Amino acid sequence: MQQLIEKASTLMEALPYIRRFSGKTIVIKYGGHAMADEKLRKSFALDVILLKYIGINTVVVHGGGPQINETLKRYGIVSEFVKGMRVTDKETMGVVEMVLTGQVNREVVGYINQNGGRAAGLSGKDGDLLICEKLLQEVKSEDGSTETVDIGFVGDVVEVNPAILQALEKGGFIPVIAPVGVGRAGESYNINADVVAGKVAAALNAEKLILLTDVSGVKSKEGELLSSIPLAEVPALIDNGTVTGGMIPKVTCCTDALAAGVKKAHIVDGRIEHAILLEIFTNVGIGTEIQA
């Protein structure tokens, strides 16, 4: 009987959050280990389905770096990276688009649908969802001067047209977006999935942006998880070296989304089963929340 009472208490803890977020939009960036482990794939699918059933409009943006790397290797194509961005020539872009839209997107849609949801896959080219311009990288030369580097078909999202997402949501579908955008001349662009999630969240005036990662969240210099960070404190955390390396672009993605109107952003460990539900529907959460 005590176990049943504890289950009821868990549901009651979630109730105020369900009431608060019903009818709102949450955008989730899905990637990392959560995509590779069968048990985590199922828990992710069930989390997303539950959100939809309780009235939360859920949009998924997925990555696919490991799958792209594997396919490029099979084709004998060697990738170069500039400041963490893959140099994407026309041949590489063809492989990237094939993997993201033809393989990974279908897989994500498939396991949501197989577990009782109604997902619909699309890329940023569908309905001109993600309009891009070429992203140029500024790098420092050995002599200290700054040089602009063309890294190929890597896109900077300059416009989001969310009508197709709104139509899918009204139809009861969970949109699943592959991070491939389109240029003004119809050319395809490879886009960072975190950036896509942030831009889409802003365009939909989302309540939350959630980035699933392979780390527990933002940590202090002593290694302790920072469960909540005010937006105004983020620049200092970067300047003093608390936020470093690959966490910087993720945190920047969150702050950009908040500045554009998203209410809260979360960096959550996707290696934990039901990480999304634990972050949203519990009093403490399990990751890092950044709030305006």
From Swiss-Prot:
GO terms for biological process: arginine biosynthetic process via ornithine; L-arginine biosynthetic process. It comes from Geobacter sp. (strain M21). CDD domains: AAK_NAGK-C (cd04250). This is Acetylglutamate kinase. GO terms for molecular function: acetylglutamate kinase activity; ATP binding. Its EC number is 2.7.2.8. Keywords: Amino-acid biosynthesis, Arginine biosynthesis, ATP-binding, Cytoplasm, Kinase, Nucleotide-binding, Transferase. It comes from the Bacteria. Pathway: Amino-acid biosynthesis; L-arginine biosynthesis; N(2)-acetyl-L-ornithine from L-glutamate: step 2/4. GO terms for cellular component: cytoplasm. Belongs to the acetylglutamate kinase family. ArgB subfamily. Substrate binds at residues 64-65, 86, 190. The record marks 29, 250 as: Transition state stabilizer. It catalyses: N-acetyl-L-glutamate + ATP = N-acetyl-L-glutamyl 5-phosphate + ADP. Signal peptide: none annotated. Catalyzes the ATP-dependent phosphorylation of N-acetyl-L-glutamate. It is found in: Cytoplasm.
